Amino acid sequence: MISSSGSILYRFLILYGSLYAGFGVQSPYLPILLDDRHLRPETIGLALAAGMAMRLMAAQAVARLADRLDAPKVILALCTTAAALIGLGYLPAQGAWLLIAVGVLHSAALAPLPPLSDTLALGAAAPAGSGGAVIHYGWLRGCGSAAFALGLVLSGQLIGHFGIVVIVWLNAALLAAAAPMPLGVPQLLATGGHARATPSQARGVGVLLRLPLYRKMVLLAMLILGSHAMHDSFAMIRWSRAGISPGTSGILWSLSVAAEVVVFLLIGRPLLDRIGPAGAAMLSAGAGVVRWAVMAETAWLPAVAAIEPLHGLTFALLHLTCMRLLAQCVPRHLEATALTIYGTVGIGIATALLTLACGPIFERFGAHGFWAMAALCAAALPLALTLREPMAGSR
């Protein structure tokens, strides 16, 4: 007989495994679906950017609703069900505006899934009376990343047999499997939720923006993390046009996910301790220059396989660096606000705007448009070098 805590763990595993596998089977291949429906690169960029913008708005709005109703489990189940159903709209959709509309609605339903599932998981990971933690959050997220990679590879293999529309069915099936799981897990919230901004919080934004180190951190994120916009939007199309099969493309992308997990869980923090934030930021920026330059010039399979693991440096190491810098310079009572600005401006808004720009760039220059992403990382190098200066404003 399975214990109560074991049953809860299994439900969380199914929830995270199904959610992140659902993300993996569709999101990397969505640009190929749009390309298959004869959308121009400029329109593909618009469609993806519109979805990102909707995710930024919907995640916050739904999180506040879940807090106000004190019903994160029900809201998560409803949003997961809605995402499964809305995603099926890609099957009949034809034409740019209808595809964009489906994408925006799908993004609105998908946006709350990671933060709401994290809210429940963090609550269950908190000490639960004398029994200790129900789950280990970091391990659970690691399982989610592994599920994303497995879904990515599986989807790539099935596309070769059933066509690109298989990603829609896989996504809907996995989200449907995840939908009832939140209702069976405990609601032990670890934090007080997403309160509305107060005048003191608004003043806190001004305090943060006056911290030189914090401004540099956000700008570094905008340049280096934002440079992934071309890859996330057009790498699959670039490889497909070069004759690389969807199955092989899925394996290539999974190399980047695996490298991200390795850096986050194993080598990232020791490397950051050894070379410091400035060295880590320069390494991330330099890796970005190399990665995007190779993407611009060749689709030779060994070369692409060699550069995809650089994602561990261009994304994971840079994220760890930003978190280290934030801890050094931001007052503790402003950490939540600082993280929100970092996530929405440094990552979200910058990536959405760059994705919008990548459409016309890819349409005009094709693969050589990746040089623009290399230029962003090159621009980050001198900024990273300034992190060696004394850290005024460190707490």
Set out the residue ranges of the language-model regions.
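Cytoplasmic helix-loop-helix junction between adjacent transmembrane helices
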Residues: 103-143
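Symmetry-related core transmembrane helices of the 12-TM Major Facilitator Superfamily/SLC fold
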Residues: 166-184, 368-386
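Hydrophobic core of transmembrane alpha-helices in multi-pass small-molecule transporters
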Residues: 17, 86, 90, 96-114, ...
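Juxtamembrane intracellular "pre-TM" segments in multi-pass secondary transporters
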Residues: 1-6, 185-220
